């Protein structure tokens, strides 16, 4: 086991604070509409330019082990806020730095760290309650656009794109962000349910220009196993032909003779038909087939349920207004499913999302909810250079997360004002002893740090701005750093999601209070460096007397 280096009391805390300050100072320059960029060197390719707090924090690794511990703890604040709310990482870092700085001063002055921690926790929970109480729901897509614009550092176009996408696919819909090959940023919306399986044969194509198979007012057969012969389903096919409606077969696979028979029937014009493989694998495939069945009002033909193809009647098939299939994807629009059953299925999947511990499973379940509940929108981010596209994509991701958070828990005044207003809830709050009161005061001071930093990044004196906002009795009075005006933040359109502000404070206080209560730090001792030359030559026997 390697030897360890141990530091105590002030020495340990000072080193830790140096690490906290290095990381926080690098992150906080990005805060606010006039925040600056940070350039991150990459060992391959062009450097990355970003204004995303968590991206900056993740890149920082310090050579001094003890300083690095402090930096890593604050990095944890940014990461946790990003995971929970998806935005607010810079605010969380600034809050954590402010609480740690003030807290360590108090410890150095002889106060009890555990009582300070209790005071900080008490104050934080009080402010969080005030933020929740001040939140109001998002009323329209204009407010959604404002939240997106603020989070994208003032780029109104990004806010509009996100509001547009949310309006089209609903609050539950999936919105993904991709890099565009061109210069323009655009939104593409896929209505209905889309899954990543294309037609099994190009002979199914009905639109030769677009190379797509388009079926209107269509029956859908959902079969769990492979289809290698069509003999068992001849009665069903005859019934479909009589109805003069097209048929889509979704099965594990359609092989050999069965596929050839379908293609021949299609080419002869006797049957409008197409076949695709079922999406997913294993248990996920079963679940997705069941989703499609509920969406289209059909049944999955499964041997587990004792169903046989020869016994299937036309009323067991699903229905949809329109199905479009290209070589990669199938889209089902306007399925014939019962609304109550679809809602019940969505609720069931939501329960699974709550229970799962795997991020991958959660993502896949959320996709299924979106496909059932709304649709899918893709925002393709364009730009002149790869570096610009990556930087914009970071901001679009942040803005998208912020708007989702706003829809979940509502909005509060932005620009750091919600924290200062929340701090007024601490008036009259006292702890059990003077040290706990000091902890409450630390939080009250720290709540001003984000507004001070926003003002400072805009080239204005932060303490003057914070003083003016604190003294105002109007709850939405604040400083618009973009225009350098004071006034009603709601009228300026400077709003933040309540969830982002709340999460930033909770995570910052949680990690900061742990650092304040640190008394000793242990790290591996650096290995002594061996000399650069090769191993020394041993003495050569019998050569002593030659000198």
UniProtKB/Swiss-Prot annotation:
InterPro entries: Chaperonin_Cpn60_CS, Cpn60/GroEL, Cpn60/GroEL/TCP-1, GroEL-like_apical_dom_sf, GROEL-like_equatorial_sf, TCP-1-like_intermed_sf. It is an enzyme of class 5 (isomerase). Forms a cylinder of 14 subunits composed of two heptameric rings stacked back-to-back. Interacts with the co-chaperonin GroES. It is found in: Cytoplasm. The gene is groEL1. GO terms for biological process: protein refolding. Induction: By heat shock. It catalyses: ATP + H2O + a folded polypeptide = ADP + phosphate + an unfolded polypeptide. Keywords: ATP-binding, Chaperone, Cytoplasm, Isomerase, Nucleotide-binding, Stress response. Pfam families: Cpn60_TCP1. One of its GO terms (molecular function) is unfolded protein binding. Residues 533-547 have a biased composition (Gly residues). This protein shows ATPase activity. This is Chaperonin GroEL 1. Its EC number is 5.6.1.7. Its main location: cytoplasm. It comes from the Bacteria. It comes from Cereibacter sphaeroides (Rhodobacter sphaeroides). Residues 525-547 are annotated as: Disordered. Together with its co-chaperonin GroES, plays an essential role in assisting protein folding. The GroEL-GroES system forms a nano-cage that allows encapsulation of the non-native substrate proteins and provides a physical environment optimized to promote and accelerate protein folding. Coiled coil: none annotated. The keyword Isomerase applies. The keyword Nucleotide-binding applies. ATP binds at residues 30-33, 51, 87-91, 415, 496.
């Amino acid at each position: 086991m390697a030897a360890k280096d141990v530091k105590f009391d002030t020495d340990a805390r000072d080193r830790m604070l140096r690490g906290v300050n290095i990381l926080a100072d690098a992150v906080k320059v990005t805060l606010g509409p006039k925040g600056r960029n940070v350039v991150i060197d990459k060992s391959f390719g062009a450097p990355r330019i970003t204004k995303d707090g968590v991206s900056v924090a993740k890149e920082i690794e310090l050579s001094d082990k003890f300083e690095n511990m402090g930096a890593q703890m604050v990095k944890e604040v940014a990461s946790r806020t990003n995971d929970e709310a998806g935005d607010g990482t810079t605010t969380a870092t600034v809050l954590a730095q402010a609480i740690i700085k003030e807290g360590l001063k108090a410890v150095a002055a002889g106060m009890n760290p555990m009582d300070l921690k209790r005071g900080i926790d008490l104050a934080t929970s009080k402010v969080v309650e005030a933020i929740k109480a001040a939140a109001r729901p998002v009323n329209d897509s204009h407010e959604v656009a404002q939240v997106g614009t603020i989070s994208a550092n003032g780029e109104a176009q990004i806010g509009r794109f996100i509001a547009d996408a949310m309006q089209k696919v609903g609050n539950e819909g999936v919105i993904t962000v991709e890099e565009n090959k061109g210069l323009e940023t655009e939104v593409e919306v896929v209505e209905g349910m889309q899954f990543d399986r294309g037609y099994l044969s190009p002979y199914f194509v009905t639109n030769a220009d677009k190379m797509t198979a388009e079926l209107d007012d269509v029956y859908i057969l959902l079969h769990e196993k492979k289809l290698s012969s069509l003999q068992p389903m001849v009665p069903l096919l005859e019934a479909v032909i009589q109805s003069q409606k097209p048929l889509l077969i979704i099965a594990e696979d359609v092989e050999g003779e069965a596929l050839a028979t379908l293609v021949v029937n299609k080419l002869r014009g006797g049957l409008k038909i197409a076949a695709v493989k079922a999406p997913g694998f294993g248990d996920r495939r079963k679940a997705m087939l069941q989703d499609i069945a509920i969406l289209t009002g059909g049944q999955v033909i499964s041997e587990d349920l004792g169903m046989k193809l020869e016994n299937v009647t036309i009323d067991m098939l699903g229905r949809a207004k329109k199905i479009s299939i290209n070589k990669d994807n199938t889209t089902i629009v306007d399925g014939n499913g019962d609304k109550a059953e679809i809602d019940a299925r969505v609720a069931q999947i939501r329960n699974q999302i709550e229970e799962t511990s795997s991020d991958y499973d959660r993502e896949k379940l959320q996709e299924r909810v979106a496909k059932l509940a709304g649709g899918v929108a893709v925002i393709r981010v364009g730009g002149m250079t790869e570096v610009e596209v990556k930087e914009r994509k970071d901001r679009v991701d942040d803005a998208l997360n912020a708007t989702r958070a706003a829809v979940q828990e509502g909005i509060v005044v932005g620009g750091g004002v919600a924290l200062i207003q929340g701090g007024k809830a601490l008036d009259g709050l006292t702890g059990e002893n003077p040290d706990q009161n000091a902890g409450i005061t630390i939080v009250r001071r720290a709540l001003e740090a984000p507004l001070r930093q926003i003002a400072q990044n805009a080239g204005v004196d932060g303490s003057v701005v914070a003083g003016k906002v604190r003294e105002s009795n109007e709850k939405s009075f604040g400083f618009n750093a973009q225009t350098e005006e004071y006034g009603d933040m709601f009228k300026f359109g400077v709003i933040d999601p309540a969830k982002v502000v709340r999460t930033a404070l909770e995570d910052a206080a949680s990690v900061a209070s742990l650092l304040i209560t640190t008394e000793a730090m242990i790290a591996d001792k650096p290995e002594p460096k061996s000399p650069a030359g090769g191993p020394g030559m041993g003495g050569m026997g019998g050569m002593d007397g030659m000198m």
